[in-house]
């Protein structure tokens, strides 16, 4: 029993150490990975590939799409399927800003969203989580309309 308790405590200590490991890559490399992942995510819309879109979502993702937040990968994919139903993409996006926590496990990407004619119609913000080495997935995503204000 004592050996089991020691093994359990040792395992917990080891896991706690892993959870707080510092970034194992440079911050610039991490930012580049997230930006590249965001561009690949956006390419899924241009390529009309809903399965590729789904591959970028964490299982417990939350998207602020529509009147209430969508919780979970399945709900997000079901809601977003309508954006992939037509031959032409209804919008496009690209990252302009990327920031990564010092811990290296969470990142923010944000940028413009354009309609098919290239007009800025919205801005997005996505929170990415590093779920495996070199594997970033979205945990939160939210868009916001832009003002079409005239001076």
Can you say where each PLM-predicted feature lies in the sequence?
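Bacterial N-terminal signal peptides
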Residues: 6-16
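Positively charged n-region of N-terminal signal peptides that target proteins for export
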Residues: 1-4
């Amino acid at each position: 029993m004592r050996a089991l308790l020691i093994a359990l405590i040792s395992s917990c200590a080891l896991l706690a150490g892993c959870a707080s490991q510092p970034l194992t890559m440079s911050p610039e490399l991490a930012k580049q990975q997230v930006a590249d992942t965001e561009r690949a995510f956006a390419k899924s819309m241009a390529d009309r590939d809903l399965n590729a879109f789904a591959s970028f979502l964490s299982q417990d993702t939350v998207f602020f799409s529509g009147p209430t937040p969508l919780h979970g990968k399945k709900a997000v994919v079901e809601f977003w399927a309508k954006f992939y139903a037509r031959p032409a993409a209804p919008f496009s996006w690209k990252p302009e800003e990327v920031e990564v926590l010092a811990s290296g496990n969470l990142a923010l990407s944000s940028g413009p969203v354009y309609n098919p004619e290239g007009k800025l119609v919205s801005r997005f913000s996505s929170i990415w989580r590093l779920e495996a080495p070199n594997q970033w997935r979205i945990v939160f995503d939210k868009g916001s309309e832009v003002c079409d204000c005239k001076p």
